[in-house]
């Protein structure tokens, strides 16, 4: 069965991408209700949507103005498909603009709204069923609807937005000016669920088992009888990709585990034991540490580090592939959060990602990225559904560039060793405290900063290690973890006493945004 035929058997809601950094959160929330959802380009045609056969369509938010010359549009025939449509922020303005209403800069109609506002519901609506008449929502718009199209009526407003929710139930068209996909909209999940279940008629029966079936069909259709290389990093993502690919294509998969000298403590042996031994993956272990470290010598800029490592990874694969003969595909554990941070067709780039854009233009492989529509928590759920043990599935995330982006400034063996040893202590103490499932991600960073200290009767001038620990639901936003003081004290004491060339520990208390999870 092909991917298309499997998809035709699965109810789905399509999200059209108009450029918000958080668009995938819409699809993410809908999938939480047991409904398959994914992003498609706003350039999609009505005919293409007919072939996909969704039960609902969401028009996402975005940074543009609908009346601008370069505004992202929509095939007008989509409004005639008879499929329920929900417009969010820019999406609502687009519906209004295209169907005869009026959108103007917010200064001409009221005030711009950025942050939480109170939504006042003026009429009952299926979309808001089970939610209070007044509720906090996240607004983020510079334009406003001042006249709604014929056939629409007002459902809700805010103090500064005369049309915060509108609908045309006859045509199954709904618009909201706020963002239900973010947690700051207190009843946002209820609103999206009402759209998916009550309005679109979703059964809510999609699961990771469905995803596995679809991806296996897609992989088999793409690969055929050809061969695939997978680069194992030791992290959760590449491990899950390896097990999924083996399930799909068996011995057509060869895994290359590159020891680039930037791994965590004992990482290499653990990877070989877990995936090579327990799961029987065909793994070639390559010691390329000198090759990588020579190239990274004296490199300070994090983007250069990422590009060098991304390029060299592929060159190592190319060398190994030439020995294997006939390898056509390179598999990667790219997640959707990686793509968002690296920018999409409509969204801006925050930083290049180690699995996105770090590859040379003359790469000799086609890419396979089975996880690129998933968030981290979904990858863990996928691993469990594939029968993987919890010690692999709940392994701490590890970036492709390894410790290179956890060492600030030029990379040296001494700095790497401080991070390896301090990170091992951190992970051990977090587990002992029973916090390893509560804290989303945690690791240490060599800040590159030296400071004066006293050990015994002597003066020291050694490195400062930063501890980074965060809580999150999907990795798109995060808060610093409020670790117990006694746990932090024990971690700090152990690192300073057990790790050479370290005399100071600091704790990173920055959320995402404004910071990213990794320091580089």
UniProtKB/Swiss-Prot annotation:
Keywords: ATP-binding, Glutamine amidotransferase, GMP biosynthesis, Ligase, Nucleotide-binding, Purine biosynthesis. PROSITE patterns: GATASE_TYPE_1, GMPS_ATP_PPASE. ATP binds at residues 233-239. Pathway: Purine metabolism; GMP biosynthesis; GMP from XMP (L-Gln route): step 1/1. It catalyses: XMP + L-glutamine + ATP + H2O = GMP + L-glutamate + AMP + diphosphate + 2 H(+). Signal peptide: none annotated. Pfam families: GATase, GMP_synt_C, NAD_synthase. Its EC number is 6.3.5.2. InterPro entries: Class_I_gatase-like, GATASE, GMP_synth_C, GMP_synth_GATase, GMP_synthase, GMPS_ATP_PPase_dom, NAD/GMP_synthase, Rossmann-like_a/b/a_fold. One of its GO terms (molecular function) is ATP binding. The keyword Ligase applies. It comes from the Bacteria. The active site is at residues 89, 179, 181. NCBIfam families: guaA_Cterm (TIGR00884), guaA_Nterm (TIGR00888), PRK00074.1 (NF000848). This is GMP synthase [glutamine-hydrolyzing].
């Amino acid at each position: 069965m092909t991917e298309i035929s499997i998809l035709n058997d699965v109810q789905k809601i399509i999200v059209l991408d108009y450029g918000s950094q958080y668009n995938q959160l819409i699809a993410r929330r809908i999938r939480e209700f047991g409904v398959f959802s994914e992003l498609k380009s706003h350039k999609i045609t009505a005919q293409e949507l007919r072939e996909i056969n969704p039960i609902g369509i969401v028009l996402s938010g975005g940074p543009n103005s609908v009346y601008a010359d370069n505004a992202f549009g929509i095939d007008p025939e989509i409004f005639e498909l008879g499929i329920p449509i929900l417009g969010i922020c820019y999406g609502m303005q687009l519906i209004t603009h295209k169907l005869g209403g009026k959108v103007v800069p917010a200064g001409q109609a009221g005030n711009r709204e950025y942050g939480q506002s109170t939504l006042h519901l003026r009429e009952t609506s299926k979309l808001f069923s089970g939610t209070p008449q007044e509720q906090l929502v996240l607004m983020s718009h510079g334009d406003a609807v001042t006249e709604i199209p014929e056939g629409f009526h007002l459902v809700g407003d805010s103090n500064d937005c005369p049309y915060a929710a509108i609908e045309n139930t006859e045509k199954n068209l709904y618009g909201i000016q706020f963002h239900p996909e973010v947690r700051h909209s207190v009843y946002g999940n209820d609103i999206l669920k009402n759209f998916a279940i009550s309005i679109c008629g979703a059964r809510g029966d999609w699961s990771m088992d469905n995803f596995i079936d679809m991806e296996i069909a897609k992989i088999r259709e793409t690969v055929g009888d050809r061969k695939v290389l997978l680069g194992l990093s030791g992290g959760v993502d590449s491990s899950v990709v390896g097990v999924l690919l083996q399930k799909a294509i068996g011995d057509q998969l060869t895994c290359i585990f590159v020891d680039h000298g930037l791994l965590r403590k004992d990482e290499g042996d653990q990877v070989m034991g877990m995936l090579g031994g327990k799961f029987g993956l065909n793994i070639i272990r390559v010691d390329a540490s000198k090759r990588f470290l020579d190239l990274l010598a004296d490199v300070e800029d994090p983007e250069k580090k990422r590009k060098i490592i991304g390029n060299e990874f592929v060159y190592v694969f190319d060398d190994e592939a030439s020995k294997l003969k006939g390898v056509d595909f390179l598999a990667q554990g790219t997640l959707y959060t990686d793509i968002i941070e690296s920018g999409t067709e409509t969204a801006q780039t925050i930083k290049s990602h180690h699995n996105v854009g770090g590859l040379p233009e003359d790469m000799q492989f086609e890419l396979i990225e089975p996880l690129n529509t998933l968030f981290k928590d979904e990858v863990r759920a996928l691993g469990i559904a594939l029968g993987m043990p919890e010690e692999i599935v709940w392994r701490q995330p590890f970036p492709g560039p390894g410790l290179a982006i956890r060492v600030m400034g030029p990379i040296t063996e001494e700095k790497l060793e401080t991070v390896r040893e301090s990170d091992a202590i951190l992970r051990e103490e977090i587990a002992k405290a029973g916090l390893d499932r509560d804290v989303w991600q945690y690791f240490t960073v060599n800040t590159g900063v030296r400071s004066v200290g006293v050990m015994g009767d002597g003066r020291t001038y050694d490195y400062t290690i930063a501890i980074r620990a965060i809580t999150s639901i999907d990795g798109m936003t995060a808060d610093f973890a409020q670790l117990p003081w006694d746990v932090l004290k024990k971690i700090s004491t152990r690192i300073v006493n057990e790790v050479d060339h370290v005399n100071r520990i600091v704790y990173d208390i920055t959320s995402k945004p404004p910071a990213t999870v990794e320091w580089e």
